[in-house]
Swiss-Prot record:
<dbReference type="GO" id="GO:0006094">
    <property type="term" value="P:gluconeogenesis"/>
</dbReference>
<keyword id="KW-0479">Metal-binding</keyword>
<dbReference type="GO" id="GO:0005524">
    <property type="term" value="F:ATP binding"/>
</dbReference>
<feature type="binding site">
    <location>
        <position position="305"/>
    </location>
    <ligand>
        <name>substrate</name>
    </ligand>
</feature>
<dbReference type="InterPro" id="IPR008210">
    <property type="entry name" value="PEP_carboxykinase_N"/>
</dbReference>
<dbReference type="InterPro" id="IPR001272">
    <property type="entry name" value="PEP_carboxykinase_ATP"/>
</dbReference>
<keyword id="KW-0067">ATP-binding</keyword>
<keyword id="KW-0464">Manganese</keyword>
<feature type="binding site">
    <location>
        <begin position="220"/>
        <end position="228"/>
    </location>
    <ligand>
        <name>ATP</name>
    </ligand>
</feature>
<feature type="binding site">
    <location>
        <position position="204"/>
    </location>
    <ligand>
        <name>ATP</name>
    </ligand>
</feature>
<feature type="binding site">
    <location>
        <position position="305"/>
    </location>
    <ligand>
        <name>ATP</name>
    </ligand>
</feature>
<keyword id="KW-0210">Decarboxylase</keyword>
<dbReference type="GO" id="GO:0004612">
    <property type="term" value="F:phosphoenolpyruvate carboxykinase (ATP) activity"/>
</dbReference>
<feature type="binding site">
    <location>
        <position position="204"/>
    </location>
    <ligand>
        <name>Mn(2+)</name>
    </ligand>
</feature>
<feature type="binding site">
    <location>
        <position position="185"/>
    </location>
    <ligand>
        <name>ATP</name>
    </ligand>
</feature>
<comment type="similarity">
    <text>Belongs to the phosphoenolpyruvate carboxykinase (ATP) family.</text>
</comment>
<comment type="function">
    <text>Involved in the gluconeogenesis. Catalyzes the conversion of oxaloacetate (OAA) to phosphoenolpyruvate (PEP) through direct phosphoryl transfer between the nucleoside triphosphate and OAA.</text>
</comment>
Length: 513
């Protein structure tokens, strides 16, 4: 500005942010009109750098440990002030946004970023309300300063970067990291703490609605198919990653999608493919010499992403909400090749598998994870984002399933016929056929076969799916080896579940070790 004070852009529009980002060298335009930005060495979340301020109003409700690490209040205040001082002479971008598409349960947020592209990401992923904060709630402050370098000895951080949540002061501080996914996941963690106190279940899931108004939820870790399977050309999308389930309905916590791009194809994922256009942020995607994105190129990371607003999707629920779900799908990526492609779960089995969260890290979103695929147990299908003890969420899930009568299914999007490296992965058309049968209600009350070792009930037929695939033992050439792997998997479930204090009815609902 003329007087030398740096400019602050308030509620800037996408075109303006893209122009500024290009002029400042923050990114480049692709042939399809999207803005490509690179995040440097951190191409995923940094769980070791995430903290929660330990203070009286929330400390007794938080499950402290390796996921939720405590940070001292005084150290937080000093660091927040230091970052504010650092931003004092910078051109800044500020937006008033909301998290939670529900009049009773939204949180108003003010997002301040050092870069134009991070502001574009925030405006794509959070909700841009017609009227900001209509219920006049206290506003959360988010500061994102990727250019600030933390000094662990001075700041009390783990490295040169940090993410810190402060529930008492309603503040989120992101310093020293460019990976934009940290912004959305930090506000997800905030809602995951706040919503259960109101009897609302926060969920790491995607959601869509059929033409008859029937809602389906898809739970799963990154890379298991949440975004791909919910982006269904025959159904209306509510959202692809974060939702709340309140008595009476399901609402999106966000206003956009953050889709994985690795090996993205127009044939298999037309909805996502068509959403990538002007206004979209492509994160760590490599382009060829003609500026055409090469989604097969994982030179920068397996975790390349597209961040776009829900408006980029033609078939969507404009109000970001839906009725309570008739069907709930737990997506698991089984690297051992043991689990069936679909199982029908009882209420107790649903609680067991929700707490277990068995799956694989596929193209993991975490820093430093190798491209090697390994199995993992991630509580509630999203352990890194849930501040309260796991039982709180499992209890809420059972309550909601029971009161509405939702049917829960376990769907394996991983391997069959042998473990990873030997067997083959279920292809997307097979999984889509299973999901089609689930959402149409064709698997309700069907004849099932009980797989004793896994303690799972498997339908004997699914329209559009080869019958031989339904019982996994049929796909293994070596039946004895299958039995061995099934035993190992059952044992690992049992060992993992020992930490949970739950009723026997849930404890005995898992595989038989």
């Amino acid at each position: 500005m003329a007087d030398g004070t740096p400019r602050t852009h308030r509620n800037p529009q996408a075109a303006q942010l893209i122009e500024i980002a290009l002029s400042r060298g923050e990114g480049e335009l692709t042939a399809n009109g999207a803005l490509v930005a690179k995040t440097g060495e951190r191409t995923g979340r940094s769980p070791n750098d995430r903290f929660i301020v330990k203070e009286p109003s929330s400390e007794n409700d938080i499950d402290w440990g390796s996921v939720n690490k405590p940070f001292e209040q005084e150290a937080f205040t000093a660091l927040w002030n230091r970052v504010e001082a650092y931003l004092g002479d910078k051109e800044l971008f500020v937006s008033e946004l909301e998290v939670g598409a529900d009049d009773a349960h939204y949180q108003p947020i003010q997002v301040t970023t050092e870069t134009a592209w991070h502001q574009l990401f925030a405006r794509n992923l959070f909700i841009v309300p017609e009227e900001f904060n209509s219920a006049d709630k206290p506003v959360w402050q988010i500061i994102n300063a990727p250019g600030f370098e933390c000094v662990p000895e001075r700041d009390g951080t783990h490295s040169d970067a940090t993410v810190i949540l402060n529930f008492a002061e309603r503040k989120v501080l992101l310093a020293g990291l460019k990976y934009a996914g940290e912004m959305k996941k930090s506000m997800f963690s905030v809602q995951n703490f706040l919503l259960p106190a109101k009897g609302v279940l926060p969920m790491h899931c995607s959601a869509n609605v059929g033409k008859e108004g029937d809602t389906t939820l898809f739970f799963g870790l990154s890379g298991t198919g949440k975004t791909t399977l919910s982006a269904d050309p025959k159904r209306f999308l509510i959202g692809d990653d974060e939702h709340g389930w309140a008595p009476g309905g399901v609402f999106n916590i966000e206003g956009g999608c953050y889709a994985k791009c690795i090996d993205l194809s127009q044939k298999n994922e037309p909805v996502i493919w068509n959403a990538i256009r002007f206004g979209t942020v492509l994160e760590n995607v490599v382009m060829d010499e003609n500026r055409i994105p090469d989604y097969t190129n994982s030179t920068l990371t397996e975790n390349s992403r597209a961040a776009y607003p829900l408006e980029h999707i033609e078939l969507r629920k404009a109000e970001n909400r839906g009725a309570e779900p008739h069907a709930v799908v737990f997506l698991t990526c089984d690297v051992s090749g043991v689990l069936p492609p679909v199982s029908i779960l009882t209420k107790e089995q649903a609680a067991y598998h929700f707490l277990s969260g068995y799956t694989a890290k596929v193209g993991s979103t975490e820093m430093g994870s190798s491209s090697a695929i390994q199995s993992t147990f991630s509580t509630c299908f999203g352990a890194p984002f849930f501040p309260r003890p796991a039982g709180v969420y499992a209890e809420l899930l059972m309550k909601r399933i029971e009161s509405f009568g939702s049917q829960v299914y376990l769907v394996n999007t991983g391997w069959t016929g042998g473990p990873h490296g030997v067997g083959k992965r279920f292809d997307i058309p097979t999984t889509r056929a299973i999901v089609d049968a689930i959402v149409s209600g064709e698997l309700k009350g069907v004849e099932t076969e009980h797989l004793e070792k896994l303690n799972l009930h498997v339908p004997v037929a699914v329209p559009g799916v080869e019958t031989q695939l339904l019982n996994p033992v049929n796909t293994w050439a070596d039946k004895a080896q299958y039995a061995e792997y099934a035993q190992q998997l059952a044992d690992s479930f049992t060992a993992n579940f020992e930490k949970y204090q739950v009723p026997d009815s849930i404890k005995h609902a898992g595989p038989n070790a």
